[in-house]
Regions:
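A short loop-to-beta-strand structural motif that recurs across blades of beta-propeller domains
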Residues: 85-87, 128-130, 218-221, 265-267, ...
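Blade-loop segments of beta-propeller domains
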Residues: 84-118, 124, 323
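A short beta-strand motif characteristic of beta-propeller blades
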Residues: 51-57, 95-101, 140, 150-156, ...
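Beta-rich, blade/repeat-based domains predominating
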Residues: 59-72, 103-118, 147-171, 218, ...
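Conserved beta-strand positions in repeat-built beta-propeller and related beta-rich domains
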Residues: 77-81, 121-124, 176-180, 210-214, ...
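A short helix->beta-strand "capping" segment at the edge of beta-propeller domains
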Residues: 36-60
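Short loop/turn segments that connect beta-strands within beta-propeller blades
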Residues: 89-93, 133-137, 224-228, 270-274, ...
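Blade-level signature of beta-propeller repeat domains, shared across WD40, Kelch, NHL, RCC1
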Residues: 331-362
Length: 362
């Protein structure tokens, strides 16, 4: 049974997926040079590619933004074809269990599942965060759809500016990172959902069009379990490239680890949002995941790699083929990833090639 659609779907043909999130950064500001990949002397992880989950209903995936596991071990896929935006598979990724919440987001970005089985999803264009129960029914929406405003540290204005990822601590506080770089939303949402919707024909018709905010106000925010805003910290760069605060996780010791993709670094905070240290990784810090044994994994975006890290940021192992692999069966963009509880299966959301990759242990 489908959950109620939140945004009206307009009929039409499903076009070919368009690569990327919001397209290239709007400036020619140089970014840090990548490290050598794979890292010298670091072993390849003992994985191979398995059979990819097939999109349902005779559709093609749009750009696949995110993957996550439910407490039962089922696979959830969040992609940018509005007709099949959320899909649930069995643990093997071979059987479709349901398709739900069509067109809940204009630009699906992150998908996380908390310990209670609630599904959290961000829409980086409409500037909202959804909390859904396991059935896909809306429990909470934070943000104002299609709106943003200048930040005030005195009080949260109730608006996000490109929310990108969510993480949870042991007390059920949750943390949101925002700020994809460029304007919010982008001047041309070509890179939004790959199925026609009402605002697509006239991008200026998206609710009350948010003001153009250069750099999109990169920020880490803390909320309590009821959704009450607690605190925030700016992650903007004083000079150099725009910050792209693309991912966040909570470590086994309760630290917050934020991936700044544009700067290719990890920034570590305590639960009070005090900055503790930075780790220059040298790879695109696109996706972070903490496995059931407390291990840290990183998807390196268009570097085409998945890394196993220690909690000092050191690379312990790698898998993939270096580069943005648009013409191969390798990883095009490791936008988000999810590791099974037994550590034997990893699913990768490839937003460039518009499919879900399955990595199986040898």
């Amino acid at each position: 049974m489908l959950s109620v659609c939140v945004v009206t779907v307009i009929g039409g043909q499903n076009p070919s997926p368009t690569p990327g999130d919001f397209g290239p950064d709007p400036t020619n500001i140089p970014v840090p040079t990548a490290a050598t990949a794979p890292p010298a002397g670091v072993p390849m992880l003992p994985f191979r590619f398995g059979t990819r989950p097939a999109p349902p209903l005779g559709q093609k995936f749009g750009n696949v933004a995110a993957v996550a596991f439910t407490p039962e071990g089922h696979l959830l896929v969040f992609n940018r074809n509005a007709q099949i935006e959320m899909v649930e598979y069995d643990a093997t990724g071979s059987t479709v269990l349901r398709v739900f919440n069509p067109n809940i987001a204009v630009n699906p970005h992150a998908l996380r599942v908390d310990r209670y089985g609630n599904i959290w999803a961000t829409d980086a264009y409409w500037n909202v965060l959804w909390k859904l129960n396991a059935k896909g029914e809306v429990l909470m929406m934070l943000g104002k759809r299609g709106e943003n405003a200048a930040w005030s540290d005195a009080a949260w204005n109730g608006m996000f500016n490109q929310p990108l990822d969510i993480a949870f601590d042991q007390d059920d506080n949750f943390y949101v990172v925002q700020g994809h770089g460029g304007t919010s939303p982008p001047e041309d949402c070509t890179f939004c959902t790959t199925y026609p919707y009402a605002a697509r024909a006239d991008r200026h018709a998206v609710a009350a069009r948010p003001p153009v905010v250069q750099g999109s106000d990169p920020r880490l925010m803390k909320f309590d379990k009821t959704g009450r805003f607690v605190a925030s910290v700016s992650l903007a760069h004083p000079t150099g490239p725009f910050a792209t605060t693309h991912t966040v996780v909570v470590s086994p010791t309760g630290e917050l680890w934020v991936g700044d993709r544009n700067a290719k670094k990890l920034i570590v905070f305590d639960r009070n949002l005090k900055r503790l240290r930075e780790i220059q990784v040298g790879y695109l810090t696109c996706a972070l995941f903490v496995d059931a044994q407390g291990g840290l994994w990183m998807g390196a975006g268009m570097d085409g790699m998945v890394f196993k890290l220690d909690w000092n940021g050191k690379v312990l192992g790698w898998f993939g083929k270096w580069g943005s692999n648009t013409d191969s069966n390798d990883i095009g963009e490791a936008h988000q990833l999810a590791v099974s509880r037994d550590l034997k299966t990893i699913y990768v959301a490839d937003s460039l090639n518009a499919h879900v990759l399955k990595m199986e242990s040898n």
